[in-house]
């Protein structure tokens, strides 16, 4: 499988948000809804996202086949620790899209 890079991951996340906006007929207010601690304009911003004190991509899980343990992948697949599956109320990312994000994290989050 070809190595995944940041532009593809950003596209997956942006497309998912666009589908959410269309389905829910409103803007998601990400900064308000997540205590101002989530974003993905850059891969660094995504890596540093820490909504409600939960690091989305813990650095010790990058590049070592532990992406499935990250809060990002866990919350995209289903609810965790009292937090509902994201994006809230769907539509959710497709399983193959989540798998691509996990592969990217496992590959060390290449640019």
Task: Please name every model-derived segment.
Residues 84, 108-109:
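Secondary-structure-rich domain cores
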């Amino acid at each position: 499988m070809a190595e995944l890079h940041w532009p593809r991951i950003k596209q997956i996340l942006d497309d998912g948000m666009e589908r959410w906006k269309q389905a829910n007929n409103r803007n998601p207010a990400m900064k308000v809804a997540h205590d101002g601690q989530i974003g993905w304009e850059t891969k660094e911003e995504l890596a540093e996202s820490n909504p409600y004190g939960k690091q989305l991509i813990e650095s010790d899980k990058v590049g070592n086949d532990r992406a499935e343990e990250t809060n990002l992948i866990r919350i995209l697949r289903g609810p965790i620790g009292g937090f509902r599956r994201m994006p809230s109320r769907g539509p959710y990312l497709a399983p193959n899209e989540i798998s691509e994000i996990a592969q990217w994290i496992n590959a060390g989050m290449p640019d």
